[in-house]
């Protein structure tokens, strides 16, 4: 079965003019990607922890500045609570409304930041918070103890543009 599938695929590649691309680029790349997956990605654990610490310090500082500007503590990660603070308590012009309240999407906050500088702190807080939770705290858990490296799966044929992507992580 595989031999007939290969023959059919080869004929299909020839008729579409991509056989050379397959033989000279795609097929050799598969072997390189397999080696890269096996080797894994080295990490500098001490540097990782230092960066994480620096960002957590900055995150706490931003939270303090946000609370000070708002005059109270609230859940900055809650769009509903943030909307109440910005648009009701502080009287900023409300843009889009959603079914759950005021929109606090990045584009809305970026517009507000032009007139209300402290909103930049909220945007920076969101960025740093996302970096910490998505990468700095999550990726070290994916380091394989036997290699001390992160091993991913490279995808050669997933993207529409032809670039290589990775998954898991």
Give the predicted meaning of each segment.
Residues 1-169:
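Conserved "right-hand" nucleotidyltransferase catalytic core of DNA-directed polymerases
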């Amino acid at each position: 079965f595989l031999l007939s599938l290969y023959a059919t695929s080869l004929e299909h590649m020839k008729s579409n003019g991509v056989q050379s691309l397959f033989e000279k680029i795609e097929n050799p790349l598969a072997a390189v990607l397999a080696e890269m997956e096996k080797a894994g990605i080295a990490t500098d654990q001490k540097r990782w922890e230092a960066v994480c610490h620096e960002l957590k310090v900055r995150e706490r500082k931003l939270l303090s500045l946000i609370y000070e500007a708002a005059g109270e503590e609230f859940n900055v990660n809650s769009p509903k609570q943030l909307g109440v603070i910005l648009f009701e308590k502080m009287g900023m012009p409300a843009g889009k409304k959603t079914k759950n309240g005021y929109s606090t999407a990045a584009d809305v906050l970026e517009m507000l930041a032009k007139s209300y500088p402290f909103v930049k702190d909220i945007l920076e807080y969101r960025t740093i918070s996302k970096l910490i939770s998505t990468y700095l705290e999550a990726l070290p858990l994916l380091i394989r103890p036997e290699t001390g490296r992160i091993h991913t799966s490279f995808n050669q044929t997933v993207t529409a543009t032809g670039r290589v992507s990775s998954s898991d992580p």
